[in-house]
């Protein structure tokens, strides 16, 4: 009763103040209008009154302490919805836009002792019948409405649904028999239910916890993956779905992990079982490496092998008959002999016993004694003199040969045709200053030799790039011979040639080459055009190597919160950085490093590189190689052979590949041609000098991998050499047919120009082009004009693969001292931005991205989830990679961002979402002004 009075007084507090003002103020006004006699008294009275009267502060809007929550009706049990607000004079429920009758409310009211405000709590009961009687597309919902003197407040809507769980699984797991260490996928789609059923897996009735056993993984689609099947994984697996209504179990799927038997190594051959004559030897092996288990196949083949053997029987030796006695000697003895050859001992037989020689006195003890003969002394003296004379003659001959050889060593080589019949005479001393004059035309070499013009005798129809050896090999030094027409470039070693050179010249060659390589290495290390770096935090960003087709996308959230990484991406041009390859393999991309190595990432980054492979992947086996910390190259991914343990994902587009990885390291894409139809794209670029004041004019034809970085390197190199692009580069499909690349020049005005190429064409060997390891590969055509007044050059250049495709360039050049040639925007000077950080690096606004992830990550019964998004965007080559991520949609959108950088293609993305029925996201994109 006291609580009720206090509540009534609290409600009336504002009203009493208002009544006092309305009643007292008019009365005071009447008193002020009374007679003048009491004016002074009235003034005193008014001075004693305050200007304003106290009143209660204004009451605030109701604030909900408890709002109704979603509820589920299990079987026929009704549910209660609760609502509490303060301050509130009234609270009512509204269900499906209709007010609930007052009698259905259970009201509890009290005054908060701290604030003195009224706290009102209301509850209602919802039955199954009420929910079932509702017709319409929307579920049954209820909402609280609270009143106070300041106004009304509405709570959130609470939906009431009838809970259920179907009995039949939409997809049940199926039993499998798998080999040891094979990946196993058990699929399960739980029954339809409200609320959505939770899924867990049982192994022999024990719950599987992937945290405890990391060999198990449960995907976001409720599928169970056994990463590498073990013998202990042989068990019965059951998918369990449960919610507040019921618990359902699928049929049991039996997984049997079998082991195929393997042979042990063969034992050593046994000794021949026959001690004399024919027999056999045998060796054995057992099917225990490993032994077959769980129905695995037994070893195929024989467990015992036998071979014939023959053991030779031993033969004991026997003496031949004694020979006749010899004549009586000077010592009065004679002798006779016999041999152990009748038969001789063989195969371990016993030797003959006894003496081989037998001697006895032949004069019955009577022997003559004679003095030494003086003739023997004369004989010995003659022999000694003859030996001395022979030694003297030998010394004289040796001195003569030594002097003759010494003169030959210091003399000049007058006729080089003695070394190779295909060249005119050349004097080595006169040509020494030109040994290191010109860089190579076709391939890089350790050192170079350039002499005067050579004429070729018996010129054939073509000059291949790999001639027979001109001279004998020179250890550790490759010397190329060039003529001024650029026609011949042998790669043979020349040891006998350098044996005629002085040691100082050979040392000069080596020192020059070492200095050249050192300078090139230093130049590349300090070349900023190959590297991009920047600082990034959890907001992510983009690193771009300008004009190289190489970039690194760091998604938002990839770097842990609160950390800042100094990241980089660089293109390697050193040949030592290229992975080793066999003859059937080719490098399809530049070698690219991203770092810092070992950085902790919470989601994959996207490394983008241009490649030169033909899009038909059926002719290719494409491998992603990674350089380990020790410098060794390892295969990371084989495209099309991914499994659950594959650490990276590769998306191959027509010209670029995108690598999703969480390991910052050095990568390169290598192609292995499975058929001769496999093709790679080449870029053909033709350069000439900016100005030419001599009669000779050189045209360089580069045959490069069709990547932006390869063309960028050549453009920089030619700019330093004073060259210019004569014609727009063209692409050529080069097949793995082992046929060479042939280059020829045609339609020259012979009255004005002549070609210094003596053959009809030049050829580059197939493997020089196919390997992709020959940097700056090119041929040179040298033309000579008859007069300096000739300033126009018109000709055609043909580049084609033998029995393959080709390209024809129509050249129309102006030869002058002023730079001429076409101006192609191959290197965009405005494209110098290397780092973009934060939200500006991404096309999709962050709120829309979060909305897409929240709505598409959860699996949908109709399949309108991240899997359909990947299918619509053609990113569904290996969905298991995305399924292992916490947000598959986010990783797919990261890959889409890298594909469409920098312009983005939001209109296409909006069209895909429209097809998937995501209208609200399309509206959001339109609101952003992007669609």
Swiss-Prot record:
Residues 41-380 are extracellular. Its main location: membrane. Mainly expressed in brain. Expressed in temporal lobe cortical neurons and in neurons of the hippocampal pyramidal layer. Also expressed in kidney. Not expressed in developing or adult lung. It is a single-pass type I membrane protein. The record marks 415-416 as: Cleavage. Glycans are attached at residues 236, 361. Residues 402-931 are cytoplasmic. Residues 1-40 form the signal peptide. The chain crosses the membrane at residues 381-401. Pfam families: Death, I-set, TSP_1, UPA, ZU5. It is found in: Cell membrane; Cell surface; Synapse, Synaptosome; Cell projection, Axon. Interacts with DCC (via cytoplasmic domain). Interacts (tyrosine phosphorylated form) with PTPN11. Interacts (via extracellular domain) with FLRT3 (via extracellular domain). Interacts (via Ig-like C2-type domain) with DSCAM (via extracellular domain). Interacts (via death domain) with DAPK1. Interacts (via cytoplasmic domain) with TUBB3; this interaction is decreased by NTN1/Netrin-1. It is linked to Alzheimer disease: Alzheimer disease is a neurodegenerative disorder characterized by progressive dementia, loss of cognitive abilities, and deposition of fibrillar amyloid proteins as intraneuronal neurofibrillary tangles, extracellular amyloid plaques and vascular amyloid deposits. The major constituents of these plaques are neurotoxic amyloid-beta protein 40 and amyloid-beta protein 42, that are produced by the proteolysis of the transmembrane APP protein. The cytotoxic C-terminal fragments (CTFs) and the caspase-cleaved products, such as C31, are also implicated in neuronal death. This is Netrin receptor UNC5C. Belongs to the unc-5 family. CDD domains: Death_UNC5C (cd08799). Residues 850-929 form the Death domain. One of its GO terms (biological process) is axon guidance. Residues 62-159 form the Ig-like domain. Residues 402-931 are annotated as: Required for netrin-mediated axon repulsion of neuronal growth cones. It comes from Homo sapiens (Human). The keyword Glycoprotein applies. The keyword Repeat applies. Down-regulated in multiple cancers including colorectal, breast, ovary, uterus, stomach, lung, or kidney cancers. Residues 694-712 are annotated as: Interaction with DCC. Receptor for netrin required for axon guidance. Mediates axon repulsion of neuronal growth cones in the developing nervous system upon ligand binding. NTN1/Netrin-1 binding might cause dissociation of UNC5C from polymerized TUBB3 in microtubules and thereby lead to increased microtubule dynamics and axon repulsion. Axon repulsion in growth cones may also be caused by its association with DCC that may trigger signaling for repulsion. Might also collaborate with DSCAM in NTN1-mediated axon repulsion independently of DCC. Also involved in corticospinal tract axon guidance independently of DCC. Keywords: Alzheimer disease, Amyloidosis, Apoptosis, Cell membrane, Cell projection, Developmental protein, Disulfide bond, Glycoprotein, Immunoglobulin domain, Membrane, Neurodegeneration, Phosphoprotein, Receptor, Repeat, Signal, Synapse, Synaptosome, Transmembrane, Transmembrane helix. The gene is UNC5C.
């Amino acid at each position: 009763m006291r609580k009720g009075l206090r509540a009534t007084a609290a409600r009336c507090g504002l009203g009493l103040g208002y009544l006092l003002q309305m009643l007292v103020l008019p009365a005071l006004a009447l008193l002020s209008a009374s007679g003048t006699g009491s004016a002074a008294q009235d003034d005193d009275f008014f001075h004693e009154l305050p200007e304003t009267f106290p009143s209660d502060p204004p009451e605030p809007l109701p604030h909900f302490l408890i709002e109704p929550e979603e509820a589920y009706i299990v079987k026929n049990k009704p549910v209660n919805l609760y609502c509490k607000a303060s301050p509130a004079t009234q609270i009512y429920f509204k269900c499906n836009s209709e007010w609930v009758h007052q009698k259905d409310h259970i009201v509890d009211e009290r005054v908060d002792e701290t604030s003195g405000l009224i706290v009102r709590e209301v509850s209602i009961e919802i039955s199954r019948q009420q929910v079932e009687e509702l017709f319409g597309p929307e579920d049954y919902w209820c909402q609280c409405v609270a009143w106070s003197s300041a106004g009304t407040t509405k709570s959130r809507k609470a939906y009431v649904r009838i809970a259920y769980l179907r009995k039949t699984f939409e997809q049940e797991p199926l039993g499998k028999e798998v080999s040891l260490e094979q990946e196993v996928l058990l699929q399960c789609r739980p029954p339809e239910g409200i609320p959505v059923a939770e899924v867990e897996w049982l192994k022999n009735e024990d719950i599987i916890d992937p945290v405890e056993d990391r060999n198990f993984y449960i995907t976001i689609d409720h599928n169970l993956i056994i990463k590498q099947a073990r013998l202990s994984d042989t068990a019965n697996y059951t998918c369990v779905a449960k919610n507040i209504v019921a618990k359902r179990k699928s049929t049991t799927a039996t997984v049997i992990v079998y082991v195929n038997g393997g042979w042990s190594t063969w034992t050593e051959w046994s000794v021949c079982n026959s001690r004399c004559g024919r027999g056999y030897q045998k060796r054995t092996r057992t099917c225990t490496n490993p032994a077959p288990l769980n129905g695995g196949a037994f070893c195929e083949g024989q467990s015992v092998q036998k071979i014939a053997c023959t053991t030779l029987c031993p033969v004991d030796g026997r003496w031949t008959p004694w020979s006749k006695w010899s004549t009586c000697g000077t010592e009065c003895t004679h002798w006779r002999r016999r041999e152990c050859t009748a038969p001789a001992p063989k195969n371990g037989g016993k030797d003959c016993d006894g003496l081989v020689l037998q001697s006895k006195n032949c004069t019955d003890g009577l022997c003559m004694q004679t003095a030494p003969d003086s003739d023997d002394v004369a004989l010995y003296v003659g022999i000694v003199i003859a030996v001395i004379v022979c030694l003297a003659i030998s010394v004289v001959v040796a001195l003569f040969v030594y002097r003759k050889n010494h003169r030959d060593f210091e003399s000049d080589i007058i006729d080089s045709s003695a070394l190779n019949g295909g060249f005119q005479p050349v004097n080595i001393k006169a040509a020494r200053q030109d040994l290191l004059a010109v860089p190579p035309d076709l391939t890089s070499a350790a050192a170079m030799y350039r002499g005067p013009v050579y004429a070729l005798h018996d010129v054939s129809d073509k000059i291949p790039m790999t001639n027979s050896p001109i001279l004998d090999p020179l250890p550790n030094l490759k010397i190329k011979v060039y003529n001024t027409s650029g026609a011949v470039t042998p790669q043979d070693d020349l040891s006998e040639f350098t044996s005629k050179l002085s040691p100082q010249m050979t040392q000069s060659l080596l020192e020059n080459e070492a200095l050249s390589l050192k300078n090139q290495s230093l130049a590349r290390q300090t070349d900023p055009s190959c590297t991009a770096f920047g600082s990034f935090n959890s907001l992510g960003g983009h690193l771009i190597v300008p004009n190289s087709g190489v970039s690194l996308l760091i998604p938002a959230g990839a770097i842990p919160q609160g950390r800042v990484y100094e990241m980089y991406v660089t293109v390697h041009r050193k040949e030592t950085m290229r992975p080793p390859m066999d003859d059937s393999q080719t490098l399809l991309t530049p070698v690219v490093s991203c770092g810092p190595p070992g950085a902790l990432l919470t989601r994959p980054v996207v490394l983008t590189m241009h490649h030169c492979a033909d899009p038909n992947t059926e002719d290719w086996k494409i491998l992603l190689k990674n350089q380990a910390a020790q410098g060794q190259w390892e295969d990371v991914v084989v495209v099309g052979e991914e499994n659950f343990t594959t650490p990276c994902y590769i998306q191959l587009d027509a010209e670029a590949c995108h690598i999703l990885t969480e390991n910052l390291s050095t990568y390169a894409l290598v192609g292995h041609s499975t058929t001769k139809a496999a093709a790679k794209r080449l870029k053909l670029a033709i350069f000439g000098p900016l100005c030419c004041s001599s009669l000779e004019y050189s045209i360089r034809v580069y045959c490069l991998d069709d990547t932006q970085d390869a063309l960028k390197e050549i453009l920089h190199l030619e700019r330093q050499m004073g060259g210019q692009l004569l014609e727009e580069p063209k692409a050529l499909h080069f097949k793995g047919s082992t046929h060479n690349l042939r280059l020829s020049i045609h339609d020259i005005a012979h009255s004005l120009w002549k070609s210094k190429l003596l053959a009809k064409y030049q050829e580059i060997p197939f493997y020089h082009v196919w390997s992709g390891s020959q940097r700056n590969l090119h041929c040179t055509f040298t033309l000579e004009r008859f007069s300096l007044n000739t300033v126009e050059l018109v000709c055609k250049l043909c580049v084609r693969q033998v029995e393959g495709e080709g390209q024809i360039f129509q050249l129309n050049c102006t030869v002058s001292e002023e730079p001429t040639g076409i101006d192609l925007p191959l290197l965009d000077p405005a494209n110098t931005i290397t780092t973009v950080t934060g939200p500006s690096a991404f096309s999709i606004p962050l709120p829309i991205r979060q909305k897409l992830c929240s709505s598409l990550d959860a699996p949908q019964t109709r399949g309108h989830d991240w899997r359909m998004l990947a299918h619509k965007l053609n990113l569904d080559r290996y969905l298991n990679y995305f399924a292992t991520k916490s947000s598959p949609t986010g990783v797919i959108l990261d890959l889409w961002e890298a594909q469409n950088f920098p312009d983005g293609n939001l209109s296409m993305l909006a069209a895909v979402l429209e097809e998937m029925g995501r209208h609200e996201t399309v509206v959001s994109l339109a609101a952003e002004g992007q669609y």
